[in-house]
Amino acid sequence: MDQPLIDDQTFQDLQNTAGADFVDELVETFAEEAPALVAELRSSLSEGAAEDFRRAAHSLKSNGHTFGALRLAEQARVLELGGFPVDVAAVDAIAAELELAIAALRELARG
């Protein structure tokens, strides 16, 4: 992928605007809650619930953009706007990307 895992400037801008301590809390909240969004992607895919799937993908996309996790945001955008159902491999890929993004965000937050 051409995009960086985390756009440093976006993350730094967020820290400058909201404060480093608050961003650290946001990152931890995201790390705790985002896996549930991936679980929602999986369950809505297996249940054929297209709207729930799109909503979970949209949330991942929005959070990704907020933190500068551009690859995560792009993968989520593709899931959100793409046809439904999607191949389960796409959900597996976003789950793996989420793990990478969370690790990188935690490292940046703790600077």
Segments (PLM) and residue ranges:
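Short hydrophobic/aromatic-rich motifs at helix boundaries and adjacent loops
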Residues: 9-14, 47-49
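Amphipathic, coiled-coil-like alpha-helical segments
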Residues: 1-9, 24-26, 31-32, 37, ...
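Short helix-adjacent coil turns
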Residues: 18, 41, 45-52, 67-68, ...
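Short, charged, low-complexity loops and linkers
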Residues: 11-24, 55
